[in-house]
Swiss-Prot record:
The protein's name in its UniProt record: Zinc metalloproteinase-disintegrin-like brevilysin H6
InterPro entries for the chain: ADAM_Cys-rich, Disintegrin_CS, Disintegrin_dom, Disintegrin_dom_sf, MetalloPept_cat_dom_sf, Peptidase_M12B, Peptidase_M12B_N, Reprolysin_adamalysin
Keyword Protease: yes
Originating organism: Gloydius brevicauda
Lineage: Eukaryota, Metazoa, Chordata, Craniata, Vertebrata
Temperature dependency: The activity is markedly reduced above 40 degrees Celsius. Calcium ions increases the thermal stability by 10 degrees Celsius.
Residues excised as propeptide: 21-191
Active-site residues, record numbering mapped to chain: 335
Domain Disintegrin: residue ranges: 402-488
Principal localisation: secreted
Gene Ontology CC: extracellular region; plasma membrane
GO MF annotations, alphabetized: metal ion binding; metalloendopeptidase activity; toxin activity
Binding site for Zn(2+): 334, 338, 344
PANTHER family, per database record: ADAM A DISINTEGRIN AND METALLOPROTEASE DOMAIN, DISINTEGRIN AND METALLOPROTEINASE DOMAIN-CONTAINING PROTEIN 28
Length: 610
């Protein structure tokens, strides 16, 4: 644990106000000028790092004093963070720059519970903060006086294009009635507090158009991406999700895909490139493309729904339509929200007095809040689909930055970390020291009850199927033992299926999940349609092309069900959606014949499948 530094920045009352000025965010018609003056109080003999872990800024907005507390965003970069660009002859150049002493911060405004703030302190102060419900931006003025900064409201930026901007994702709300019911649920503080964090390892990609737009200045593009990621991390922490930047890629020598104004084509091409190229050389969970191209119509973003962790479809595309990082961050958070199973908000969804991130149309003032509907949908997706790539919390030894008590991450030298003393809700943990209180054996974990290890034999993870036995506490640890499955290929459900990654996938259950009761696996003749290789009947996709099923593989393509429900008589019912082509396909590991299972669109011998 390191000594927390207190840095006071005195900002003199602005000596003048401007009526209009051109800043990085655009033409601002009303702003205040402030002069930061930094005073550092360090313990005697302490070595001052380039960028402190904690800082405090004091200044005035509209003549009223504001105290801004900032803490370095320790979760911004991953241990294996890398940057890739290309030489003029197309050679890939990848580096692993040091990122421990970076200059990107989150924080809070004193005495304003609803305040949000995301600031970079690389060359002066740049970013945004919300104060008393209004969004302000701050950035250095490019004057000979390098200490001058502009502070202005978002509403005072002159917008060149006032036309409404939209996400390209469409959906049928008539078919999503459960969301309305879910939006009416109220989570208790205890439920929210103990929701486990998830970790999204993100790669940001900039196309050749971004390079041209920024006059070939790769450092400028990278700085922009750092600021976008810092904002994303701040936005998603309220969803109990940490977004860590694991890589930046810039297509400096030319686009690696065909980037067109058609969002369907561009998203599909980017998804295929991510699967076949990016994922083979860089471990990550999600990739977002930032492009300078102007998408057709009012669309500025597009993504696949419920696709997080999918090797191909865990992607989104965002148009660089605004110079304001906060605006682009909200659009990117919106598209990543689709990847996390979140749909557009409806009239019954609420963010209190604010607009919501998942509105189909981007609001006049960008919101950094997800609605109650979004929270429910996101965690329904996480709990129901279990996207495994975002489950693993980085080990304390994997975090390259110095441990900081109070950041809610268990790091080297800490026994617990429940946040700041003001926010800590853990009765077992001393928030000031990140050590367990006297008499406590544990402060967290599925095998920790009232600060003591649970008794040996206490069930800590229930069985999800006969292929996934329950786990029990050992009595010697607060952690539940590792989740162990029966061996893949072991017969299950009275030989109707074979175990696969802890489940027993059979077609009847998959039909039930799609259509409900009274729907069963269809006759074999229905599956012959998978030989067509058309938009719905195929076994797999290769380089964007749908490959028809071989005769022996027809039961490993599109799923066909027989609907016997009242008023229905459909012997070959199937599900297909342009938004999610994979939904409705027979799941991997499903039995496709005696001693055979589906694997990569083929019906193979279970003895050799795994």
């Amino acid at each position: 644990m390191i000594q927390v530094l207190l840095v006071t920045i005195c900002l003199a009352a602005f000596p003048y106000q401007g009526s209009s000025i051109i800043l990085e965010s655009g033409n601002v018609n009303d702003y205040e000028v402030v002069y930061p003056r930094k005073v550092t109080a360090l313990p005697k003999g302490a070595v001052q790092p380039k960028y402190e872990d904690a800082m405090q800024y004091e200044f005035k907005v509209n003549g009223e004093p504001v105290v801004l507390h900032l803490g370095k965003n320790k979760q911004l970069f991953s241990k294996d963070y890398s940057e890739t660009h290309y030489s003029p002859d197309g050679r890939e150049i990848t580096t692993n720059p040091p990122v421990e002493d970076h200059c990107y911060y989150h924080g809070r405004i004193e005495n304003d519970a609803d305040s949000t703030r995301s600031i970079s302190a690389c060359n002066g102060l740049k970013g945004h903060f919300k104060l008393q419900g209004e969004t302000y931006l701050i950035e250095p003025l490019k004057l000979s006086d390098s200490e001058a900064h502009a502070v202005y409201k978002y509403e005072n930026i002159l917008k060149e294009d006032e036309a409404p901007k939209m996400c390209g994702v469409t959906q049928n709300w008539e078919s999503y009635e459960p969301i309305k019911k879910a939006s009416q649920l109220n989570l208790t503080p205890e439920q929210q507090r103990y929701n486990p964090f998830r970790f999204v390892e993100l790669v940001l990609v900039a196309d050749k158009g971004m390079v041209t737009k920024n006059n070939g200045d790769l450092n400028k593009i990278k700085t922009r991406m750092y600021e976008l990621a810092n904002n994303l991390n701040d936005i998603y922490r309220y969803m109990y999700i940490h977004v860590a930047l694991v890589g930046v890629e810039i297509w400096s020598d030319g686009d690696k895909i065909t980037v067109t104004p058609n969002v369907d084509d561009t998203l599909s091409s980017f998804a295929e490139w991510r699967k076949t190229h990016l994922l083979t050389r860089k471990k990550h969970d999600n990739a977002q493309l930032l492009t300078a191209i102007d998408f057709n119509g009012p669309t500025i973003g597009y993504a696949y729904i419920a696709s997080m962790c999918h090797p191909k479809r865990s992607v989104g595309i965002v148009q660089d339509y605004s110079p304001i990082n906060l605006v682009l961050s909200v659009v990117m958070a919106h598209e990543m929200g689709h990847n996390l199973g979140i749909h557009h908000d409806h009239s019954y969804c609420s963010c209190g007095d604010y607009a919501c991130i998942m509105g189909a149309t981007i609001s006049h003032e960008p919101s950094t809040f997800f609605s109650n509907c979004s929270y429910i949908q996101c965690w329904d997706f996480i709990m129901d689909h279990n996207p495994e790539c975002i489950v693993n919390e980085p080990l304390g030894t994997d975090i390259v930055s110095p441990p900081v008590c109070g950041n809610e991450l268990l790091e080297v030298g800490e026994e617990c970390d429940c946040g700041t003393p003001e926010n800590c809700q853990n009765e077992c943990c001393d928030a000031a020291t990140c050590k367990l209180k006297s008499g406590s054996q544990c402060g967290h974990g599925d095998c920790c009850e009232q600060c003591k290890f649970s008794k040996s034999g206490t069930e800590c993870r229930e069985s999800m199927s006969e292929c996934d036995p329950a786990e029990h506490c050992t009595g010697q640890s607060s952690e539940c033992p590792a989740d162990v499955f029966h061996k893949n290929g072991q017969p299950c459900l009275h030989n109707y299926g074979y175990c696969y990654n802890g489940n027993c996938p059979i077609m009847y259950h998959q039909c039930y999940a799609l259509w409900g009761a009274d729907v069963y696996e269809a006759e074999d003749s229905c599956f012959e349609s998978n030989k067509k290789g058309n938009y719905y009947g195929y076994c797999r996709k290769e380089n964007g092309k749908k490959i028809p099923c071989a005769p022996e593989d027809v039961k490993c393509g599109r799923l066909y069900c027989k609907d016997n429900s009242p008023g229905q008589n459909n012997p070959c019912k199937m599900f297909y959606s342009n938004e999610d082509e994979h939904k409705g396909m027979v799941l991997p590991g499903t039995k496709c014949g005696d001693g055979k299972v589906c694997s990569n669109g083929h019906c193979v011998d279970v003895a050799t499948a795994y």
